[in-house]
């Protein structure tokens, strides 16, 4: 008795929840003998919980409740009281078997309540066998100090989850799926709502939203998933840089000549430059021809058709005259300067786009060169009198059978070297224009009153380079008759 009074000086105050009147009277008498006065009795668990939650709450230190009343209420009465009020709940069990009390889903709920119970007493109570105060003292100590005991390992509910109005005293979160009710206080002005904490995590809402976005992106499949992943993982600046790089890169196509494929990687050419051969087909109305235009005092310019390999037209052709293909060119500049030939009109000097000469030319030109003189520009037209010979030669030349037939692809990674003589067409033996006799002299250029004639039979050693990177001819190489 002294030990009990050391814990409960005024005795152990008990609340009794039972609808059996006879058992209620018997239990009240027995508890009084054990210095455990009954301060309140209720017939339902909801009524008892309403009393404990009211403003004029009695000094109750433990609750004795018939387990059948808890089953009929539909919620775990013990867990709610021990979590919110730290009041131990002891179940009262009748002499009948639990399986005979309820059936179906209620039987499963009953087994759950008995398994998680703090303490169970059989009815009727026997004052000689029970030591109620020891059980209550120990369990209250565990609840107040939050020290989990063997029977408290399942208590994970916590109070203080803020409501909509920010009042933490009105909401208690309980991890129990059977708790689905609202408890109204006696004065009616404040409500206490019991909810279920379905989210055991305590992460921030922003982190949760970001995690949901990432999970949604990972779950998405197909084009939609790829689109979302690309926009989330690829910054805008990096995306624009990649697009610009793709636009700047220029790939060699099949219509490029062997010479352009070899030297193009070393050139810094803009994507919009006319040197970029877009691969368009030459109109069938225009037959690919070679035209030469000579300006007074300037080196002759060669007009090449667009999209046709250079080496197909320059087989046996040299920079400053000599053997060449017997392909006629129209004397009218308007017919020559169509859209495809204008691409290479205004580029570098003669021979800058000339392919290396072939050791064995397919055919040579034996007809004399006919020259005409005018006040402005002198046009030299390469013609052939024998058209049948021209047709025979063209039929026998495999490279000219198909104007757009391209040579084998060249690996751009290989080192291809071209000598200056090859680029200028000076590695072949030049035929001086005056060596052709009177006809050649008659067809040569007679410029000025003095009839100055320039011979084009030059060697590389006879050409000097001045500081302006231009060719300078020695004075003794040009003579006046």
UniProtKB/Swiss-Prot annotation:
Gene3D superfamilies: 3.40.50.2300
Keywords (A to Z) from UniProt: Activator, Cytokinin signaling pathway, Phosphoprotein, Two-component regulatory system
Residue span, Response regulatory domain: 13-138
Modifications after synthesis and translation: Two-component system major event consists of a His-to-Asp phosphorelay between a sensor histidine kinase (HK) and a response regulator (RR). In plants, the His-to-Asp phosphorelay involves an additional intermediate named Histidine-containing phosphotransfer protein (HPt). This multistep phosphorelay consists of a His-Asp-His-Asp sequential transfer of a phosphate group between first a His and an Asp of the HK protein, followed by the transfer to a conserved His of the HPt protein and finally the transfer to an Asp in the receiver domain of the RR protein.
GO biological process, one term: cytokinin-activated signaling pathway
Positions of post-translational 4-aspartylphosphate modification: 66
Family stated for the protein in its record: Belongs to the ARR family. Type-B subfamily.
Task of the protein: Functions as a response regulator involved in His-to-Asp phosphorelay signal transduction system. Phosphorylation of the Asp residue in the receiver domain activates the ability of the protein to promote the transcription of target genes. May directly activate some type-A response regulators in response to cytokinins.
Protein's recorded name: Two-component response regulator ORR32
Species per Swiss-Prot/TrEMBL record: Oryza sativa subsp. japonica (Rice)
Lineage, opening ranks: Eukaryota, Viridiplantae, Streptophyta, Embryophyta, Tracheophyta
Gene field: RR32
């Amino acid at each position: 008795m002294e030990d009990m009074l050391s814990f409960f000086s005024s005795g152990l105050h008990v609340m009794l929840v039972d609808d059996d009147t006879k058992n209620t009277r018997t239990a009240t008498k027995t508890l009084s003998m054990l210095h455990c006065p009954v301060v309140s009795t209720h017939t339902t668990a909801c009524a008892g919980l309403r009393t404990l939650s009211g403003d004029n709450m009695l000094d109750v230190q433990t609750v004795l409740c018939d387990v059948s009343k808890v089953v009929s209420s539909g919620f775990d009465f013990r867990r709610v009281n021990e979590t919110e009020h730290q009041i131990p709940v002891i179940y009262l069990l009748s002499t009948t078997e639990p399986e005979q009390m309820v059936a179906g889903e209620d039987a499963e709920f009953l087994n759950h309540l008995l398994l998680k119970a703090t303490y169970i007493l059989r009815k009727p109570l026997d004052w000689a066998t029970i030591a109620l105060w020891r059980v209550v003292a120990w369990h209250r100590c565990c609840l107040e100090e939050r020290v989990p005991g063997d029977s408290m390992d399942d208590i994970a509910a916590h109070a203080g989850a803020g409501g909509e109005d920010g009042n933490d005293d009105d909401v208690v979160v309980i991890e129990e799926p059977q708790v689905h009710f609202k408890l109204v206080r006696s004065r009616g002005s404040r409500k206490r709502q019991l909810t279920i904490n379905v989210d055991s995590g305590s992460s921030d809402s922003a982190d949760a939203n970001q995690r949901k976005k990432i999970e949604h992106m990972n779950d998405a499949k197909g084009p939609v998933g790829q689109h979302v992943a690309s926009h989330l993982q690829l910054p805008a600046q990096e995306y624009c840089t990649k697009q610009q790089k793709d636009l700047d890169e220029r790939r060699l196509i099949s219509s490029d000549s062997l010479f352009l494929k070899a030297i193009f990687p070393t050139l810094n050419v803009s994507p919009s430059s006319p040197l970029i051969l877009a691969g368009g087909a030459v109109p069938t109305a225009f037959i690919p021809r070679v035209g030469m235009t000579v300006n007074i005092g300037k080196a002759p310019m060669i007009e090449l058709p667009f999209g046709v390999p250079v080496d197909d037209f320059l087989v046996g052709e040299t920079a400053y005259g000599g053997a060449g293909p017997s392909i006629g060119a129209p004397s009218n500049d308007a017919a020559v300067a169509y859209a495809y030939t204008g691409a290479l009109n205004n580029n570098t000097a003669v021979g800058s786009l000339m392919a290396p000469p072939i050791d064995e030319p397919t055919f040579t030109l034996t007809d004399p060169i006919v020259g005409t003189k005018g006040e402005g520009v002198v046009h030299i037209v390469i013609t052939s009198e024998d058209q049948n010979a021209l047709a025979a030669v063209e039929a026998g030349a495999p490279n000219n059978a198909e104007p757009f037939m391209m040579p084998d692809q060249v690996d751009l990674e290989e080192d291809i070297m071209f000598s200056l003589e090859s680029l200028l067409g000076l590695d072949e033996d030049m035929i001086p224009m005056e060596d052709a006799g009177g006809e050649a002299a008659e067809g040569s250029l007679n410029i000025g009153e003095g009839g100055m004639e320039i011979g084009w039979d030059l060697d590389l050693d006879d050409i000097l380079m001045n500081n302006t990177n231009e060719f300078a001819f020695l004075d003794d190489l040009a003579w006046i008759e």
